[in-house]
Amino acid sequence: MAGVMKLACMVLACMIVAGPITANALMSCGTVNGNLAGCIAYLTRGAPLTQGCCNGVTNLKNMASTTPDRQQACRCLQSAAKAVGPGLNTARAAGLPSACKVNIPYKISASTNCNTVR
């Protein structure tokens, strides 16, 4: 389990350093993952859901205000989930918006077609 946490932290650190967002650029995966960093323990170790995690989910929803940004956020979430691998609790990931009382227009799942997100 420690190996999964190290991998998850390394992936998040790399994505956070990925670079700033420019005015017309899509939301970066660093931004997406940075907002959800507080959710790692909840999603991988079954820790209790924290307000910090839910604040990140809310921030992410508010930042993804355009269709291209929502599609990019979807792709970033899928990439991060693949990087974490089998240590990710997919049911908790799918239920994260609901648990945080945040409505997002797509399901957090590896099977989500991000191109159809509006």
Curated annotation (Swiss-Prot):
Pfam families: Tryp_alpha_amyl (PF00234)
One MF annotation (Gene Ontology) recorded for this entry: lipid binding
Disulphide linkage map: 29-76, 39-53, 54-100, 74-114
UniProt GO cellular component terms: chloroplast; endosome; Golgi apparatus; plant-type cell wall; plasma membrane; trans-Golgi network
Keywords: Disulfide bond, Lipid-binding, Signal, Transport
SUPFAM superfamilies membership: Bifunctional inhibitor/lipid-transfer protein/seed storage 2S albumin
Gene Ontology BP annotations: cuticle development; phospholipid transfer to membrane; plant epidermal cell differentiation; regulation of cutin biosynthetic process; response to water deprivation
Signal peptide: 1-25
Primary role: Plant non-specific lipid-transfer proteins transfer phospholipids as well as galactolipids across membranes. May play a role in wax or cutin deposition in the cell walls of expanding epidermal cells and certain secretory tissues.
Family designation: Belongs to the plant LTP family.
Protein name as annotated: Non-specific lipid-transfer protein 2
Species the sequence originates in: Arabidopsis thaliana (Mouse-ear cress)
